[in-house]
A protein has these predicted regions:
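Small cysteine-rich, disulfide-bonded extracellular modules of the LU/uPAR three-finger superfamily
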Residues: 1-76, 83-119
């Protein structure tokens, strides 16, 4: 059996960064609440170039125009997508419930994806 070389893993990481451009925030039932694209100022790739662990950071505030009308709202998961709506999740992660109840609340999600995954 062949082995993927470091350059192959870097190519996979580059593909993910170039194509998985949306983060979907989910509620306590893991139902979609909001999907935000990497072009939005609230979402950025924050890992070091060439790092094995990709990191996307998303910061939302209760005062955001697409959030304030949802309050109070509990967030408990996130997923990465290639498309703006519908589509299949490329990666999913659950986190401790956070209930945003006022416009002064803020949630920071640091979504980490290790390629390759090392156990």
């Amino acid at each position: 059996m062949s082995v993927v070389q470091n350059a192959g893993y870097q190519d996979i990481r580059n593909y993910i960064q170039d194509n998985w451009k949306y983060i979907e925030l989910r509620d306590e039932d893991q139902d979609p609440v909001l999907r935000i694209g990497i072009g939005d100022s609230r979402v950025t790739w924050t890992h070091t170039a060439g790092a094995q662990t990709l990191e996307m950071t998303c910061v939302i505030k209760g005062s955001d125009s697409d959030v304030k009308n949802l309050l109070p709202k509990t967030f408990a998961g996130a997923a990465l997508f290639k498309v703006e709506s519908e589509g299949s999740a490329m990666s999913e992660e659950e986190f401790t419930n956070f209930t945003m109840s006022s416009e002064s609340d803020q949630l920071t999600i640091i979504y980490q994806l290790e390629v390759p995954q090392v156990d």
